[in-house]
Amino acid sequence: TPLTSITILFAAFLVSAAPFAQAQTVTINGRDDGYRGIWYMNQPSGDEYVYKYSGGLGTYCAKHIPFAWYSQETNRTYFCYGGTDVNNSTLFHMVSYFDHTTGRVAKPTCVLDKRTDDAHDNPVINLDDQGYVWIFSSSHGTARPSYISRSVRPYDIDQFQLMWSGNFSYPQPMYYPGKGFLFIHTWYVAGRGNYMMTSNPEGTVWTQRRELAYFEDGHYQISGVWNGMKTGIAFNMHPAGKGLNYRTNIYYMESDDFGATWRTVGGTILDIPLKSKTNPALVYEYESWPRNVYIKDTRFDSQGHPLILFVLSKGY
């Protein structure tokens, strides 16, 4: 099936909005004197490669979106990354910006200490239509809390306030002017389920968490936005019982009404949450090859057709 013929409409939902819970104070709001990204490793491999992957991972991973956001009003690109101390002993959530007028970067602000050295807890960033800078602080699984923080003043990184604490992984917040955030993320509940929440324009009231897909042993997903109108999500699946390092197939869904309904490009309405690996969202079947599928990006062409960047592999 060509990518230009994939769409997903998912059943409309209405959930009651609830205000953010009061969050525990963990903010630091201190300026650092330079840039130190977190170094991280994962899963000793017992061979010449030593680890499954390792290195400087301050902007890890591909499923954390976005790490940077351009503001036309200030001519700055605001960005975040996973920082650390001189001993690489903890993960700081850092925010700064590049000023395109002066060609200089600001000294970064340390928003909070995540109290881990796991780069899966790296933050992502976005700006709302009033210029407030938002930081979504991830967690690797459910053992640690996740946070949502907002700048005290528009376009300013000096001070952030904690808006919410709870739990989410692989955060992908997209802001729709006049509507609010459509927040795509993973929630570890006996696996890796695909979820979403939406907010009011101010980002202070959110819907309850909504499950989009959860079958076999879960998924990794990557979302993208077209023209401020449409959100698309590409994801794979972990076949049941085969372990984390086995992932296959490509699925895709999109919404053009702020997450109320989701469709295939062909207009097929999906029964959400998706609960079977055989469903209309399936784009390519690779389980029988067998091949691992690593989804790396979801974009759109000028006409709004989805483009999915992925890697095929015989192993990990």
Label the model's feature ranges.
Residues 1-3:
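N-terminal secretory signal peptides that target proteins for export/translocation
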Residues 24-316:
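Extracellular, repeat-based ectodomains that mediate carbohydrate processing or recognition
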